[in-house]
């Protein structure tokens, strides 16, 4: 029996860190094909193609410099070619690009392909909230799991100990993905509440923007802790309103929940850019260009999508933190008023 073929759809900071793990495991485990393809959006780096650099130097010099990728990870610039014959697709691209990628892949996959989304964000469908894994699953007709956790990519690539959560309705798929991705320093728990796991991954980026505003305005640790707690309460309230499946508080205690929220509010790029926004008054777009080396922020865009859903349901005032982040980012509300928005939070009534 030939091993299962794996394709990583995406090659940014997080995609490259995951490629390091998946490539290492696939080379050692008999029931995976050792050759792992990684779709790379082709870029010119100092006159050379990024795919060529990755395939000769085994390093993503743009998005994960200083880390060697296993030689069995092969960069491919054509997404259809990269995913050809794949049994497992790992999706790890900015959420705003997933629709276009699915359109390209549609009709080109094996009948029994399974997918896992590492993408943190939500989409706005005609009936309100659409999770990214749902978008992929529906467009491609494949069963989807998700992986979310307190996983800052550079630390994962450095092989520093951390945990993560796989949400999978299908237990066999969950175990297969765990085997493919778990290492001694990347520990995985599998749970069945896919929707809750994914909602956590998306919403924590909005809270992190709020935490960054808090840092930029010079508030202390007490204020930031309050922002994190109120953010968590809004995440739970939102999940209970909008998830189709069951939502248990226990899932919020997994790595995908409170752990990911804490690490993102202290160490992630959404926090970093939001702090600079509060300090400098430059636009989010400008700071993205200056600070992120071509990466995209997920927090502000998720806040906008969420705001639209909450408006549609007439529930904006039930989520003051999410709403305040949206208004500061998109409606020119002074960032200095951010804390005022939390002083009359429903949690305190």
Curated annotation (Swiss-Prot):
Q: Which residues carry this modification: Phosphotyrosine?
A: 326
- EC code(s) of this entry: 1.1.1.8
Q: Which InterPro entries match?
A: 6-PGluconate_DH-like_C_sf, 6PGD_dom2, G3P_DH_NAD-dep, G3P_DH_NAD-dep_C, G3P_DH_NAD-dep_euk, G3P_DH_NAD-dep_N, NAD(P)-bd_dom_sf
On whether NAD is a keyword of this UniProt record, the answer is yes
State the Gene3D superfamilies in the record: N-(1-d-carboxylethyl)-l-norvaline Dehydrogenase, domain 2, NAD(P)-binding Rossmann-like Domain
- Kindly state which keywords UniProt assigns to this record, in alphabetical order: Cytoplasm, NAD, Oxidoreductase, Phosphoprotein
Phosphoprotein among keywords: yes
Q: What are the boundaries of the signal sequence?
A: none
Q: Which Pfam families match?
A: NAD_Gly3P_dh_C (PF07479), NAD_Gly3P_dh_N (PF01210)
Q: Which residues carry this modification: N6-succinyllysine?
A: 289
The entry's function note states:
Has glycerol-3-phosphate dehydrogenase activity.
What's the protein called, per UniProt?
A: Glycerol-3-phosphate dehydrogenase [NAD(+)], cytoplasmic
- Which gene is this protein's source? GPD1
């Amino acid at each position: 029996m030939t091993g299962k073929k794996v394709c990583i759809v995406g090659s940014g900071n997080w995609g490259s860190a995951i490629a390091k793990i998946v490539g290492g495991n696939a080379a050692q485990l008999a029931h995976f094909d050792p050759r792992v393809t990684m779709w790379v959006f082709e870029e010119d780096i100092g006159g050379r193609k990024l795919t060529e650099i990755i395939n000769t130097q085994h390093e993503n010099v743009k998005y994960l410099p200083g880390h060697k990728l296993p030689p069995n990870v092969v960069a491919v610039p054509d997404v259809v070619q990269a995913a050809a014959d794949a049994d497992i697709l790992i999706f790890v691209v900015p959420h705003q690009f997933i629709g276009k990628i699915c359109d390209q892949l549609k009709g080109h996959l094996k009948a029994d392909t399974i997918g896992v989304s590492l993408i943190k964000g939500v989409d706005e469908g005609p009936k309100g909230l659409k999770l990214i894994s749902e978008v992929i699953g529906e467009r491609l007709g494949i069963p989807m799991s998700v992986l979310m956790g307190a996983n800052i990519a550079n630390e994962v690539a450095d092989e520093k100990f951390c945990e993560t959560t796989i949400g999978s309705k299908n237990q066999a798929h969950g175990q297969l993905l765990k085997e493919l991705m778990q290492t001694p320093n990347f520990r995985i728990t599998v749970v069945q509440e896919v929707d809750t796991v994914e909602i956590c991954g998306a919403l924590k980026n909005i809270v992190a923007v709020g935490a960054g505003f808090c840092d930029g305005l010079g508030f202390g640790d007490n204020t930031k802790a309050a922002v994190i707690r109120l953010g968590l309460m809004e995440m739970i309230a939102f999940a209970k309103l909008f998830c189709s499946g069951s939502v248990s508080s226990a899932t919020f205690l997994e790595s995908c929940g409170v752990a990911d929220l804490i690490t993102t509010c202290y160490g992630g790029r959404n926090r970093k850019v939001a702090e600079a926004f509060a300090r400098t008054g430059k636009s989010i777009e400008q700071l993205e260009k200056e600070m992120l080396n071509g990466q995209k922020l997920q927090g502000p865009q998720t806040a906008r999508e969420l705001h639209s859903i909450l408006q549609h349901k007439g529930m904006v005032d039930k989520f003051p933190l999410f709403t305040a982040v949206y208004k500061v980012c998109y409606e020119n509300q002074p960032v200095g008023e951010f804390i005022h928005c939390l002083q009359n939070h429903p949690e305190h009534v």
